[in-house]
């Protein structure tokens, strides 16, 4: 089953890659690795929600936003590589725009991790990860996700 078919089976569609908001590209291929820029929870060019997780945005909503970010990361990867050529997800970096005292950061980033595991499988989808709480994110986004994947030789 292709990656697009797996996404469809999950009720998801690969979006068009979001345009960069500054001086960078959505993804870079270097050897057999693809690095994405940080992806925001954007649908059709618009930020789905903004604000701090734990005050303006619930942890549950933020987890769903992290899934949108991961889907956008797949779209970014598809600009430079065939998604069906992804061997495995290597690493996910998750950044959560936190209200003071909000510490459930790993649960938010799980939204991205769980989607990638569903799409690429339990072995190839599991990855190393960083989940960091931050004071601010671009455009006041609640979540930002970056992904590194390894391509098949």
Regions of interest found by a model, annotated:
Residues 1-153:
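Short, polar/acidic, helix-capping and beta-turn segments at strand->helix junctions
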């Amino acid at each position: 089953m292709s990656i697009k078919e797996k996404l469809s089976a999950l009720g998801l569609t690969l979006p068009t890659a979001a345009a960069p908001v500054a001086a960078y590209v959505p993804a870079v291929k270097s050897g057999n690795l693809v690095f994405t820029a940080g992806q925001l929870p954007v649908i059709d060019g618009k930020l789905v929600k903004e604000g701090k997780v734990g005050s303006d945005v619930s942890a549950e909503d933020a987890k769903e936003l992290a899934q949108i970010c991961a889907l956008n990361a797949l779209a970014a990867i598809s600009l430079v590589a065939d998604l069906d050529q992804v061997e495995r997800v290597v690493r996910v970096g998750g950044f959560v725009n936190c209200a003071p005292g909000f510490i459930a950061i790993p649960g938010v980033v799980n939204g991205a991790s769980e989607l990638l595991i569903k799409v690429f499988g339990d072995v190839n989808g599991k990855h190393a990860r960083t989940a960091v709480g931050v004071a601010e994110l671009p455009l006041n986004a609640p979540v930002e996700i970056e992904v590194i994947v390894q391509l098949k030789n």
